[in-house]
Structure formats: C-alpha cells, structure tokens
C-alpha cells in the first residue's frame, strides 16, 4: 500500500472523533472573533486559551457555576500577578453569559481587566451569588469601559447593585444598556454621577412603568444624557414619562417610547427643552397625541392605529415624519397589528402602498408640509 493513502486511513478515526467532539471555542481565521460554548456537563475550560488573540470574545457558560475558579485564583488581592498577561490581550469587546458567578470572582475579574484595553462588556443571563468583597480604593481600578450592557442579570444586593458595580469601573462610561432587570429601584444616594453617560437604554423592562422610571433615573446622576430608550418598558402615558424626566432633571435629545401601550392623555406634557427626536411607533395610538413638542427633527408615528390622516394643527413642525403602517395608509394593518401583538409578536411595520418609487413617509411629508 502506498504510504500516503495508508497514512490517511490511519487518520480517519481521529478525524471522525474530532467531528464528534468539537472544541468548545472557535477562533475565526482573522483572529478577530472567538466564541466559546461550554455547554458540556464537564466542559474543557482550558479551550478558552484559543481566544487570547481575539478582539471580540463571547463566553457562554452553559449554566455552569464558576465557583471552582474562585478557589483557584485570588483575583481580588493578588491581581498584579496577572497584569502582564492581561495587558497583552487584544480584546476590546467581551460577552459573558449563561453562568452562575460568585460576586468576589466577578469583581476580581473586573479589577484585573483594569489592565486591559477592553471597551465593551456585556453580561447576559447571569446569576451573581455570594457576598461582594470590600470596595476598592477611592480610585476605581477596573476597566475603562465605553459601553456596558446587562441582560437578565440577578444580583444579591437588590437595588444597591448599580452603585456597587460602579465602584469597580473607571469613570467615563458612555453607554449603559439594562434589559430584563430584576430590579431598577436603585439606591440613588449611593450612585455616583455618570458624568460622561450619553446613552441609557432601559428597554425590555415591561414592569418598569412611570413610577419605576422615577426610581431608575436617579435625580441629577445623568447630566450628559442625550439618548433615552424605553421600548417595551411599561410606559402608559406621555405625561407620566415627562414628569419622570423632569423629576430626574434629564434633558434627552432622543426619546424612544416605541412598543409601549400608550393611552390617551388628558394632561399636557411638559417636554424636555432639548428633545428633537421622538419615537412613538407601535404604541397603539388611535390619534395624534395632543401637546407634542412644538418642533421636532424626527417624529415616528408608524405602525399605530391612526384611521385618518393628521389634520392641520395636530402635528408639530417636523423635519422627518414617519406615518407608515397606519390603517389610513394600509387597509387591514390595524387588525393585523392587534392580532400579532395579542399573540406576543411584534410585527415588522407594513410598507405603505403610496407612491411610485417614494416611501409613504416622504409622500406624506410633501402633503403635510402644507399644514405644518
């Protein structure tokens, strides 16, 4: 038998075994993205070493507890021993999900990541357990993040979790996303000012509501806030939202209230003076709300239940207006939206039939400018 075919025959069992037991971590050919899925009952955690060259890293823990790593490494008091290794990492974006992690381990890792160039951190489907260690010195020693995203993360300290986590991050956070939170009733007296935060996204918290929004928007803790997203956040009235914003002292330029069931409001809203973009799509509105800001750059009223075109005087002065997907433009759209929404599905906005190469929005704008 020729040597080369013979060698291939000998390797076949190894190749078959390799396909049957794939590595939990995969690094792409450009050393940019690395994804680990430790879903096996006894995962090979050492496979994560493959991700050391990557810029974007995702670690999915398969629901396992990371308690064993707390016993193996003292990241809290002896973090400098890891400094050289962490400084060499290229990672800029890190996602960790589906694990149970002891609080000392999580905060210890954050402290070690202070030596890294990490800019974006996302935690998803995580249960933080145990008691946190004492806070670090006054100067924060954690990573200098620009973006922090948290989805379905449970903390052992209730409303104090944000202030506790904040102590382990360097100042300068610009974007904060919190979805499916177990509590947003923060201990505001303990929360430090987010002086650089321009974007706050509290979407996908249906139990929040206007009262919860007052507790979440700690007064005068978000002085630089420009973009506020509250999609599917249990908002009921525009007046209630406006009151919460006023109490918190925030002046967002962009406000997203889409996917909330808004009802008709008898009280007029005192809008933030800086507001120039308002998204009210998928809110079930049957008419244009009264008391909208006098002037907006962007107003999105698409995918609602408007049965007629807005009348003169109902709309503010607006540069970019979207009314696509309303019943007066798309016959049957209202019934379709109601059926899908009741089933828990948020449909894509139906396209408007208006216009020969022109979107319904642009076509309507041309007609609307006569009475705006």
UniProtKB/Swiss-Prot annotation:
GO terms for molecular function: lipopolysaccharide binding. A lipid is attached at residue 342 (GPI-anchor amidated asparagine). GO terms for biological process: cellular response to diacyl bacterial lipopeptide; cellular response to lipopolysaccharide; cellular response to triacyl bacterial lipopeptide; inflammatory response; innate immune response; positive regulation of lipopolysaccharide-mediated signaling pathway; positive regulation of toll-like receptor 4 signaling pathway; positive regulation of tumor necrosis factor production. It is a lipid-anchor; GPI-anchor. Glycans are attached at residues 37, 152, 279, 320. Its main location: membrane. LRR repeats lie at residues 54-82, 83-118, 119-145, 146-173, 174-197, 198-225, 226-252, 253-275, 276-296, 297-318, 319-346. One of its GO terms (cellular component) is Golgi apparatus. InterPro entries: LRR_dom_sf, Monocyte_diff_Ag_CD14. Residues 343-372 form a propeptide. The keyword Cytoplasm does not apply. Residues 1-17 form the signal peptide. Residues 287-372 are annotated as: Required for response to bacterial lipopolysaccharide (LPS). Disulfide bonds join 25-36, 34-51, 188-218, 242-269. Keywords: Cell membrane, Disulfide bond, Glycoprotein, Golgi apparatus, GPI-anchor, Immunity, Inflammatory response, Innate immunity, Leucine-rich repeat, Lipoprotein, Membrane, Repeat, Secreted, Signal. It is found in: Cell membrane; Secreted; Membrane raft; Golgi apparatus. The C-terminal leucine-rich repeat (LRR) region is required for responses to smooth LPS. Belongs to the lipopolysaccharide (LPS) receptor, a multi-protein complex containing at least CD14, LY96 and TLR4. Interacts with LPS-bound LPB. Interacts with LPAR1. Interacts with the TLR2:TLR6 or TLR2:TLR1 heterodimers; upon interaction with ligands such as diacylated lipopeptides and triacylated lipopeptides, respectively. Interacts with MYO18A. Interacts with FSTL1. Coreceptor for bacterial lipopolysaccharide. In concert with LBP, binds to monomeric lipopolysaccharide and delivers it to the LY96/TLR4 complex, thereby mediating the innate immune response to bacterial lipopolysaccharide (LPS). Acts via MyD88, TIRAP and TRAF6, leading to NF-kappa-B activation, cytokine secretion and the inflammatory response. This is Monocyte differentiation antigen CD14. It comes from Oryctolagus cuniculus (Rabbit).
């Amino acid at each position: 038998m020729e040597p080369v075919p013979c060698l291939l025959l000998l390797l076949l069992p190894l190749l078959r075994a390799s396909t049957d037991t794939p590595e939990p971590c995969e690094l792409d050919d450009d050393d940019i993205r690395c994804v680990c899925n430790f879903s096996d009952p006894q995962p090979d955690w050492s496979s994560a070493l493959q991700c050391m060259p990557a810029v974007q890293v995702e670690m999915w823990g398969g629901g396992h507890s990371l308690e064993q790593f707390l016993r193996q490494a003292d990241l809290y008091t002896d973090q400098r021993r890891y400094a050289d290794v962490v400084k060499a990492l290229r990672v800029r974006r890190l996602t960790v999900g589906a694990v149970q992690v002891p609080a000392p381990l999580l905060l210890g890792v954050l402290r070690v990541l202070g030596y890294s160039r990490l800019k974006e951190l996302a935690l998803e489907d995580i249960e933080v357990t145990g008691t946190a260690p004492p806070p670090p010195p006054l100067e924060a020693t954690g990573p200098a993040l620009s973006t922090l995203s948290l989805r379905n993360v449970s903390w052992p300290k209730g409303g104090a979790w944000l202030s506790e986590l904040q102590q382990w991050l360097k100042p300068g956070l610009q974007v904060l996303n919190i979805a499916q939170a177990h509590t947003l009733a923060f201990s505001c007296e303990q929360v430090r000012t987010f002086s650089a935060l321009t974007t706050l996204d509290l979407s996908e918290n249906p139990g929040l509501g206007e009262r919860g929004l007052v507790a979440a928007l700690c007064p005068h803790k978000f002085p630089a806030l420009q973009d506020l997203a509250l999609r599917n956040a249990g908002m009921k009235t525009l007046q209630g939202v406006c009151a919460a914003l006023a109490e918190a002292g925030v002046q967002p330029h962009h406000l997203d209230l889409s996917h909330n069931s808004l009802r008709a409001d008898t009280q007029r809203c005192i809008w933030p003076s800086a507001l120039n973009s308002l998204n009210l799509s998928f809110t079930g509105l049957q008419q244009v709300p009264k008391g909208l800001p006098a002037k907006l750059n962007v107003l999105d009223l698409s995918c609602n239940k408007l049965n007629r075109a807005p009348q003169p005087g109902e709309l503010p002065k607006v540069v970019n207006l979207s009314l696509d997907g309303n019943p007066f433009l798309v016959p049957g759209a209202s019934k379709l939206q109601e059926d899908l929404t009741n089933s828990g599905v948020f449909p894509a906005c139906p396209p408007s039939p208006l216009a020969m190469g022109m979107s319904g929005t642009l076509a309507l704008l041309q007609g609307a400018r006569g009475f705006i």
